[in-house]
A protein has these predicted regions:
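Terminal amphipathic alpha-helical/low-complexity segments used for targeting or macromolecular assembly
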Residues: 1-91, 202-232
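Solvent-exposed, flexible loop/coil residues
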Residues: 50, 57-58, 63-66, 99, ...
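Left-handed beta-helix
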Residues: 91, 96-97, 102-103, 108-117, ...
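Conserved phosphate- and dinucleotide-binding cores of soluble alpha/beta proteins
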Residues: 140-144, 200
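Extended alpha-helical regions
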Residues: 165-168, 173-232
Length: 232
C-alpha cells in the first residue's frame, strides 16, 4: 500500500513537471514566432529578426520569464527566483516570476524596468526603459497594477498599486500613476492626470513626451483656475 502510494505520488509529480515543460516550451515557441515582428513594428532601429532574438534584452527577459513563471506556478520558487535573478543580471530587467506577461509584450531598451509579483501585463503592451510596475502595500494579495491590451508605458514612468491601466492607454514619460486610467486615455505628470483633448495636440508622436506633458497639464490647470498667463 505504501509503495503504491509513493509510486502514484511520483507519477503525479512527473506528470506535473512534464506539463509545465510542455506549457513553457509552447509559450517560448510562440514568442520566438511573434516577438521579432512585434519589436520591428515599434523600433525603427531593428535590422533583422535574428538581431531581435539574439541581442535585444527585452526579448531575452520575456523568454527567461516564461521559464521562471512556469517554475513559480509549479511551486519551485527558489529555482524560479534563480532564473529571474540570472535574467536580471544579463538584461538589466527585473520581472518577478509570479508576474503574468501576455503575448507580444515589447520591452524597449529595458534597462531598469521592474515588474512586481502580482502585476498583470496583457497582450501587445509596450514598456520603455526605467518603468516600475510596483506595489504600494506590504500585503500578500494583489498589490501591483494590471496593464490592459495595447497600452504604452513611457520612459521612467511608475505605475503603483493594484490599479488598472485601460486598453490602448498611454502613460507619459516620468509619470507617477496612482489611480486607474481609462481605456484610450493619455496621462502624464506627478501625480498623473489625464491630458485633455486640447492638450493632446501638443504631444508629439505616439508616446507622450514628459516636457510636453508637463506644459500641457500646467496650461489646462491654469486655464481652469483663471490664472493669467504670460505670453512671449
Amino acid at each position: 500500500m505504501g509503495l503504491a502510494f509513493l509510486s502514484d505520488a511520483k507519477g503525479k509529480r512527473n506528470g506535473s513537471l512534464l506539463g509545465m515543460i510542455s506549457g513553457v516550451a509552447a509559450e517560448i515557441f510562440r514568442d520566438v514566432g511573434e516577438l521579432p515582428s512585434a519589436v520591428r513594428e515599434k523600433d525603427p532601429a531593428v535590422r533583422s529578426q535574428t538581431e531581435v532574438l539574439l541581442l535585444y534584452p527585452g526579448v531575452k527577459a520575456v523568454l527567461a520569464h516564461r521559464v521562471a513563471h512556469g517554475l513559480w506556478q509549479s511551486k519551485q520558487h527558489f529555482a524560479a527566483r534563480a532564473v529571474s535573478e540570472f535574467s536580471r543580471a544579463v538584461t538589466g530587467i527585473e520581472i518577478h516570476p509570479g508576474a503574468v506577461i501576455g503575448s507580444r509584450v515589447v520591452i524597449d531598451h529595458g534597462m531598469g524596468v521592474v515588474i512586481g509579483e502580482t502585476a498583470v501585463v496583457e497582450d501587445d503592451v509596450t514598456i520603455y526603459q526605467g518603468v516600475t510596475l510596483g506595489g504600494t502595500r506590504n500585503v500578500r494579495r494583489k498589490r501591483h497594477p494590471t496593464i490592459r491590451t495595447g497600452a504604452t508605458i513611457g520612459v521612467g514612468a511608475s505605475v503603483l498599486g493594484d490599479i488598472e491601466i485601460g486598453a490602448l492607454a498611454q502613460i507619459g514619460a516620468g509619470a507617477v500613476v496612482l489611480s486607474d486610467v481609462p481605456a484610450g486615455a493619455r496621462v502624464g505628470g506627478i501625480p498623473a492626470s489625464e491630458l485633455k483633448a486640447r492638450s493632446r495636440s501638443k504631444v508629439p508622436g505616439g508616446v507622450p513626451n514628459s516636457a510636453a506633458d508637463s506644459k500641457a497639464i500646467f496650461e489646462d490647470r491654469a486655464a481652469s483656475s483663471d490664472v493669467d498667463r504670460v505670453h512671449s
